[in-house]
């Protein structure tokens, strides 16, 4: 079949675009089986069916098109948009991840010079930005599953590549979340396996810093996860409660406010151990964290997360107190302050939260009471302002209403009566009024005559 041309669609291809808009996967599958349908056909704007499906957020449709060989990096759009850019604009995290796994390039720019991550950030789809920025191709990890050079064995067993890749690509950098991911996979939760994993992470970190296009963000992330793995090894070797003990150490809060001091110190120590002191990112992190006292904002975790994942602080979202997962929607039933993503996280955190739960409850109730008082005060103030406005309006209406004198002047009969009175006065005292001059010259003569008459009267 000849390569597709922009705007040259067969009737079946036009039907396919319509079916994609409706989300009918079965009908789309039937049309894709037709010899008259090219999976990468282009509409008049240069959009492929995959771009249409990604922009409309059709997950199953995207999966179907990729199975049929859709080109995830097709760049025929009139403004240079790719399928990954449309996925980011749609805000669909699953489709964004799907495009990346299918091999979508993240550094391609459109006609205005923006990458997919920048376009997603521009429209406020910060979750998609985080996914794109944290994506790590599986092929780069599979490289270490094969013997290289003089090595007789690979640095990373094949069975560990999948679980390790899942942790590397996670967008949640909370240390408890990383330990939970290790704990849930029996293959990883062993000393030998973790040792191999953190050595590979150190190699990736070194490669990121020494390659031509240096990637400090990815290097810092690999180093951070490596530090968490090394602590896991320590607890597996030295503690009877093993990883559960590590999680408790990370969550244990100090008595006065429940702040997890050990967790904060661990993250600060991990950043400080970054082996490339000249890195700009390291210097920025140190400047942001060093002046902050333990227990104050910003925490080391929040600063590190923003630097690595690109998550912004002004986004309104609730995070789980235990594992840091975004979108927590369950509150402690007593204090109504602490958030969790599920009951397991609440149970895990209860051993330390119970010490400060009542205190937090009192603080919360006090804040609610003050908020209610402030609300009532604002309502009273608003009512008072409205009453003053109404009173001012009534006063202005009274002032603008015509009085009894104005009514008298408005009566034409009174005007006539006044004119008659004036005529009578003029008849009785003709000397009292000077004649109205017709010209300036006559006016001056008349004034002179009056003045002369007054002088004569005074002499007599």
From Swiss-Prot:
The keyword Zinc applies. It comes from the Eukaryota. The keyword Repeat applies. It holds the Pfam family Ank_2. InterPro entries: Ankyrin-MYND_dom_contain_2, Ankyrin_rpt, Ankyrin_rpt-contain_sf, Znf_MYND. GO terms for molecular function: zinc ion binding. Signal peptide: none annotated. ANK repeats lie at residues 45-74, 79-108, 159-188. Keywords: ANK repeat, Cell projection, Cilium, Metal-binding, Repeat, Zinc, Zinc-finger. It is found in: Cell projection, Cilium. SMART domains: ANK. Zn(2+) 2 binds at residues 332, 335, 353, 357. A zinc finger (MYND-type) spans 320-357. Zn(2+) 1 binds at residues 320, 323, 341, 345. One of its GO terms (cellular component) is cilium. Residues 371-460 are annotated as: Disordered. Residues 371-387, 425-436 have a biased composition (Basic and acidic residues). May be involved in the trafficking of signaling proteins to the cilia. This is Ankyrin repeat and MYND domain-containing protein 2. It comes from Gallus gallus (Chicken).
């Amino acid at each position: 079949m000849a390569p597709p041309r922009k705007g040259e669609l067969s009737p079946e291809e036009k039907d396919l675009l319509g079916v994609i808009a409706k989300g009918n996967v079965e009908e789309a599958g039937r049309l894709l089986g037709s010899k008259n349908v090219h999976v990468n056909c282009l509409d008049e704007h240069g959009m492929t069916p995959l771009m249409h499906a990604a922009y409309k957020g059709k997950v199953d449709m995207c999966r179907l098109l990729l199975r049929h060989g859709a080109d995830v990096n097709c760049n025929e759009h009139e403004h240079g948009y790719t399928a990954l850019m449309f996925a980011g604009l749609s805000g669909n995290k699953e489709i964004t991840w799907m495009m990346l796994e299918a091999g979508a390039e993240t550094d391609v720019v459109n006609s205005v010079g923006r990458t997919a991550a920048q376009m997603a950030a521009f429209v406020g789809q910060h979750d998609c930005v985080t996914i794109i920025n944290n994506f790590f191709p599986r092929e780069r990890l599979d490289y270490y599953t094969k013997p290289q050079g003089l090595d007789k064995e690979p640095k990373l067993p094949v069975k560990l590549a999948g679980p390790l890749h899942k942790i590397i690509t996670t967008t949640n950098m909370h240390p408890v979340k990383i330990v939970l991911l290790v704990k849930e996979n029996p293959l990883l939760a062993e000393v030998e396996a973790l040792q191999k994993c953190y050595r590979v992470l150190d190699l990736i970190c070194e490669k990121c810093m020494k390659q031509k296009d240096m990637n400090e963000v990815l290097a810092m992330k690999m180093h951070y996860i490596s530090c968490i793995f090394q602590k896991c090894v320590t607890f597996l070797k030295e503690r009877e409660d093993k990883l559960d003990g590590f999680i408790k150490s990370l969550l244990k809060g100090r008595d006065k406010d429940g702040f997890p001091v050990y967790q904060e110190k661990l993250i600060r120590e991990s950043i400080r151990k970054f082996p490339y002191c000249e890195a700009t990112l390291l210097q920025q992190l140190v400047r942001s964290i060093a002046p902050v006292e333990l227990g104050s904002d910003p925490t080391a975790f929040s600063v590190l997360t923003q630097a690595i994942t690109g998550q912004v602080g002004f986004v309104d979202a609730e995070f789980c107190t235990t594992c840091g997962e975004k979108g927590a929607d369950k509150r402690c039933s007593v204090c109504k302050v602490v958030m969790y993503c599920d009951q397991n996280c609440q149970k895990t955190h209860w051993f330390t939260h119970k010490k400060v739960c009542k205190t937090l409850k009192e603080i919360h109730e006090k804040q609610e009471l003050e908020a209610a008082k402030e609300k009532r005060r604002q309502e009273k103030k608003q009512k008072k302002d409205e009453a003053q406005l109404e009173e001012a309006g009534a006063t202005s209406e009274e002032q603008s209403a015509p009085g009894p004198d104005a009514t008298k002047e408005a009566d034409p009969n009174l005007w006539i009566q006044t004119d008659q009175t004036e005529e009578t006065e003029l008849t009785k005292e003709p000397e009292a009024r000077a004649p109205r001059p017709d010209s300036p010259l006559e006016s001056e003569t008349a004034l002179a005559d009056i003045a002369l008459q007054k002088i004569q009267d005074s002499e007599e």
